[in-house]
């Protein structure tokens, strides 16, 4: 019995380690961009881990109305990073959490509706969305490689210094080397090993402060509305609703992938229960001032690698995350990681997000001219909106935030163009089916003559 318990714990810890780096990146990126205090950043990291655990349990424990019942793990969504920073910069941090609460309620209430719309999210759409998410995050990773543009709201005098660039490139190279020579589970730890080694090197260089660790309490009960009462603004809410739809699209692909790994065909009812669980997870994130959550693809890869597909492993992993979230000192360790080290690691991860999107696009019919037009226009408009934000300066603030985020602009373009061209395809197919009997009849008459 003890041997079995140890095996379950070890396999569960493996799942936690596989997603840990990705889970803590979002609070680090958002917290630093919004210039929160060290104490507030420690809270964001702790509550993020706790909410990841709760969200995982909600999704894994198959209920009558909630939870898809697959061994899936949830983490903070990368697609929410840029919109959260934009909302926080324009409306304040309170508007961020008001919009997240609204998005969670929206997804929960309309889960059944989304369950009937999965045909609108083929690989040409999901692949484009995931590719845009990666492309939108890469600039943040590169800026962190240079040391981060700002420190506590002030310009960083060491931005672009040789030390920062060498440190970040060293982390990047180490991760690549580990991926080349390590195998199995050890390879899945390459990002964490790179971050740990980079932080150790930065500490030797005098670039690391552990004051946040010493100041953080050993135990902390999560506080609803840690940053104060949420503010409900129409612009941020619309933006976060779109983020929620993009999260649904992304999670749908992961649900199907894990269902295939586990040999369990998914029904519309299963998807609806999965969407409800994600809606509740996002709502909890808003109430406790955390983040929107979605299903993590890296854990699907780990399931494929280990061949261990039992739900109790992931349930235990969710419990481990909850425990970690109740111990702020552990969370504070992550806040001590220098921006340059984080940048070296995130560039790899964000690049992998792009690669995942390209892989999804490769499963689409790229001989179809309409698919190529959908991909081309969506990515072009998405990148354009991100790189030339000034073009929307004259727009009202709510609309400006919505359209200036490249991921949202590109995702909406992909969804609408796919729908438009799908209707065109159906009309052409109907026309061909109508013309075919006429053609056959004509040929028959010619043959008789």
From Swiss-Prot:
Gene Ontology molecular function: xanthine transmembrane transporter activity
Membrane topology value: Multi-pass membrane protein
GO cellular component, one term: plasma membrane
One of the Pfam families matching this protein, by short name: Xan_ur_permease
Record's subcellular location: Cell membrane
Keyword Nucleus: no
Membrane-spanning parts: 11-31, 41-61, 67-87, 91-111, 119-139, 158-178, 191-211, 229-249, 277-297, 313-333, 334-354, 372-392, 401-421
Function: Uptake of uric acid.
Record family assignment: Belongs to the nucleobase:cation symporter-2 (NCS2) (TC 2.A.40) family.
Record-given protein name: Uric acid permease PucJ
